[in-house]
Amino acid sequence: MRLTAKQVTWLKVCLHLAGLLPFLWLVWAINHGGLGADPVKDIQHFTGRTALKFLLATLLITPLARYAKQPLLIRTRRLLGLWCFAWATLHLTSYALLELGVNNLALLGKELITRPYLTLGIISWVILLALAFTSTQAMQRKLGKHWQQLHNFVYLVAILAPIHYLWSVKIISPQPLIYAGLAVLLLALRYKKLRSLFNRLRKQVHNKLSV
């Protein structure tokens, strides 16, 4: 039984709630002492993990729609991607304002360059910014074939973001390893497309070097 357009609309409502409720919980936890001994780190890790969850959910949609024969599921992919960007922006903002402080924002650029795991994080965020900005149908029509080329960079984020998470924790725990494993699994499901993209990129580089 395939999903109807009305059911997908209700699914989108549920997904919006899934994006909003963690934020409401975080606000409650901040105001009622629900965080741990280092609340700044807790906020950073919570926002980062939530962004990663939405990234993984975004990557899951295409194979799920194909294997479950639910083509209308694709309509939820943009929504999930935008929530991923929103939480990634909260993650970056929490680091800039809470870790560095308002008076030390000038150090942000230096921090992003001198700390490799932060470099991976900001590269991922910039890609997500570009994908969010060009996610509308109007931008898709305007960019034409280049739109898909740009949005294929989500696979790079799927590689960089888990590495950023693993690199940022001082003690390796099961949680970041689980996220990394899920990312690898989802990328493996897109193996044929990734191989095609890699071969195309290699051919383009070879052609440019041959000129």
Curated annotation (Swiss-Prot):
Cofactor note: Binds 1 FMN per subunit.
InterPro entries per the UniProt record, alphabetical: Fe3_Rdtase_TM_dom (IPR013130), MsrQ-like (IPR022837)
Subcellular compartments: Cell inner membrane
Periplasmic side: 31-44, 103-115, 168-170
Description of the deletion phenotype: Cells lacking the msrPQ genes display no visible growth defect.
GO CC field: plasma membrane
Cofactor(s) essential for the protein: FMN; heme b
Quaternary data: Heterodimer of a catalytic subunit (MsrP) and a heme-binding subunit (MsrQ).
Family: Belongs to the MsrQ family.
UniProt-recorded name of the protein: Protein-methionine-sulfoxide reductase heme-binding subunit MsrQ
Organism (species): Escherichia coli (strain K12)
